[in-house]
Amino acid sequence: MDGRGLRPYMNTREDRAIRFLGLPTLLRSTGDDTNGAFGLVEHWSMPTGFASPYHVHHLEDEAFYVLEGELAFVCDGKWIRTGAGGYVFGPREIPHGFKVTGTGPARMLLLCAPAGFERFVMELGEDPDAPAVEPDIPKLVAVAAKYKIDILGPLPG
């Protein structure tokens, strides 16, 4: 342990798996692991056509690193397409979202700094072995507001 109270650790896909917005999701790091510095989430099997809502974070910045597949990101109304190895930064206070555009599933890491977004993910998380269901939008909006995230609606055209 160092002076900040942090310990090295490792996790596997089985350690902190949940289903978030119908997606198989893994909590790689939480604020508890990083002393509040960041949270790291892996969406490890996003189907073609999946789209996040257009939204704004007021407390944290988001960084997306695409591991597999093809995605389109929209940030402040501007679209960016990228594939494996692509990196997109979404600053707080700027509307953004993404959708899977390739012919197969996509996988990405989502880092939020400071930590906190992962608590939103955990609160909405479901049993990873349960079948995927459509998200409960009123619940999503209410829980997002608790974490200072505004859900603006579907992604812009």
Language-model region placement:
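Glyoxalase I/VOC metalloenzyme domain signal
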Residues: M1-G3, Y9, A115-F117, G125, ...
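Short acidic-glycine-tyrosine-enriched beta hairpin
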Residues: Y9-N11, I18, E70, G77-P95
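Hydrophobic small-molecule pocket/channel-lining residues, especially in calycin-type beta-barrels
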Residues: F50, H57, L71, Y87, ...
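Acidic/histidine-enriched, glycine/proline-rich intrinsically disordered or flexible terminal extensions
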Residues: M122-G157
